[in-house]
Design a protein with these regions (language model features):
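Soluble "head" domains of membrane/secretory-pathway proteins
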Residues: 2-15, 51-300
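Hydrophobic membrane-insertion alpha-helices, especially the h-region
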Residues: 19-38
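Cytochrome P450 fold signature focused on the C-terminal beta-domain
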Residues: 41-42, 127
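N-terminal signal-anchor transmembrane helix
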Residues: 42-53
Length: 300
């Protein structure tokens, strides 16, 4: 009888401890999920397009909450269905020179924007909603902004490359968005390009039709067509357009090897995951060793 009582007591004690451990790990998992969705998440850098700021093998922490975390139907997005993206309230805007992680807006084809939840890029924000951007001699310029924009050393280097014949050997594509021969924009001479802000209005002249066609079709889920001097959105004639979303111009820091807004156009705000903060781990892909000098480095 005494032995049975001891066994029951032992089972009660250890059963309680086991339940507490299970509860603890369940709560830990819930905290991990909630923080990953609403607060901060991690991404691994797959390429050298953001060197020297970010290197291949860097694992970065991305702030989701300051601008507001995104909410959408993940399962529908994984099935590549159209999803409505909502953003929670935040206390900070995305600013020029922020390093942003986002879903690449052209995962399938270059003439239409689509949301691919599994396709992520990281680039530096050069121009924000309401800005007017130009590229002069490979250097970024924003009207009314006197500070630096992007990696100025890389802009100097690209200018020298384009002044020589070396860019041909490196396979650098000089032509840029919107790839119109008459307009003649390039990665050396580009713009001026107005970066649409939510609520801003543009006239539907021949230039704006070309520059903003993909954005308008994505917002409206209607085709933009032209009949002589008439612009049709679906079956409706329009002479101007009011944007529903904010947009950004982004660029890689390694400008001679980065496919960014110079080539594919503007980034819709709903596609932005958040702002890169720090490198929490960095691993050499060849040797497998940790790059301790880069661990916990602030991303600037």
């Amino acid at each position: 009888m005494e032995t049975n009582d001891r066994q029951k007591s032992w089972l009660k004690v250890w059963g309680g401890r086991l339940l507490n451990m299970i509860f603890f790990f369940c709560m830990l998992f819930v905290v991990y999920l909630v923080s990953g969705v609403f607060i901060v998440t991690s991404f691994k850098i797959p390429s050298d397009s953001m060197e020297p700021s970010l290197q291949t093998g860097d694992c970065i922490l991305v702030d989701k909450c300051s601008k507001g975390a995104r909410l959408f139907d993940v399962f529908a997005a994984l099935e590549k269905k159209e999803v409505k993206i909502h953003r929670m309230p935040g206390w900070r805007k995305f600013n020029r020179n922020d390093v942003l992680v986002f879903n690449f807006p052209y995962p399938g084809r270059w003439d239409s924007i689509a949301f691919d939840v599994m396709s992520y890029y990281v680039k530096r924000c050069i121009a924000v909603p309401g800005d007017t951007l130009e590229i002069k001699d490979c250097h970024y310029r924003v009207k009314g902004h006197d500070g630096y924009l992007g990696n100025t050393a890389a802009q100097d280097k690209l200018q020298k490359l384009l002044d020589s014949e070396e860019f041909v050997n490196r396979g650098i594509v000089v032509e840029s968005y919107p790839f119109d021969k008459e307009l003649g924009w390039s990665i050396a001479e580009f713009g001026p390009l107005y970066i649409p802000a939510k609520g801003s209005v543009v006239e539907m002249d021949s230039l704006n039709r070309m520059l903003y066609r993909n954005l308008i079709e994505w917002e409206q889920k209607e085709k933009l067509t032209f009949r002589r001097d008439t612009v049709l959105l679906g079956d409706s004639v329009i002479s101007r357009y009011c944007f529903r979303e904010n947009y950004y111009f982004v660029s890689g820091d390694k400008m001679e090897n980065s496919k960014d807004s110079r080539y594919w156009g503007l980034l819709p705000e709903p596609f932005i995951v958040g702002r890169a903060l720090r490198i929490w781990k960095s691993k050499d892909d060849r040797s497998g060793s940790i790059k301790w000098g880069r661990v916990w480095k602030k991303i600037e």
